Regions:
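A nucleotide-sugar donor-handling region in carbohydrate enzymes
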Residues: 1-42, 166-168, 196
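Catalytic donor nucleotide-activated moiety binding site of glycosyltransferases and closely related
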Residues: 33-38, 56-87
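Catalytic binding pocket for nucleotide-activated donors in carbohydrate/polymer assembly enzymes
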Residues: 108-174
């Protein structure tokens, strides 16, 4: 699913496509907020409280906040602000190309985003509860960005440009970084089928 993120032509075309659709974002700093859901099928799904207005008001008029919520959160109301844009229906990988930095939490998209070597922040005010109740695939000490337990820590981290070790994170989770993973899988399946006949 990530081969396209190694393709500079795809990234450029994706960014240009979205800028044509949202010309107000041209030459702006774009913060992508893409959290995973909380809850479950029995209790319902929800999103962590996130003060997007406070965040965006902490930056100048050249900064925009775009939301890309998890598909299970499609009915969440977002703050009404001229520099906050709901991009629920846009392709996630195309938004990666458009954005300058990512705010997420325990979403698996952080793995994909790391390919682009762009800054990430982890907004997890429920960190201890989440780890206790749900758990995490990865030791959070390996996360390639500042872990923020409240909106003020997040704003401060972005303002100070506090960054993590993206290269190390990417190298742990992507053995191959050449955009040919799909080709390898197809060849492997072909070889297995060929041997079984």
């Amino acid at each position: 699913r990530v081969d396209c993120l190694f393709d500079d032509n795809y990234l450029k075309a994706s960014k240009n496509k979205l800028l044509a659709k949202y010309p107000i974002l041209k030459d702006k700093k774009i913060i992508l907020y893409a959290p995973t859901f909380r809850g479950n099928i029995y209790q319902g799904f929800s999103m962590l409280p996130f003060d997007g207005e406070k965040l965006i008001n902490s930056f100048d008029e050249n900064t925009y906040l775009i939301y890309k919520l998890h598909p299970l959160l499609k009915n969440i109301c977002l703050p009404q602000h001229p520099r906050i844009i709901d991009m629920f229906n846009e392709d996630t990988h195309e938004l990666f190309a458009l954005s300058d930095l990512l705010i997420s939490d325990f979403s698996s998209i952080v793995f994909d985003y790391s390919i682009l070597n762009k800054t990430m922040y982890f907004y997890v005010p429920d960190l201890n509860d989440y780890l206790k109740d749900v758990g995490c695939y990865v030791n959070i000490d390996l996360f390639p960005g500042k872990i923020c337990k409240n909106i003020d820590e997040l704003i401060q981290g972005i303002q100070k440009n506090e960054v993590g070790n993206l290269e190390a994170f990417k190298n742990i989770f992507f053995e191959y970084q050449d955009g040919k993973n799909t080709k390898r899988v197809v060849e492997l399946i072909y070889d297995i089928l060929k041997k079984s006949l």
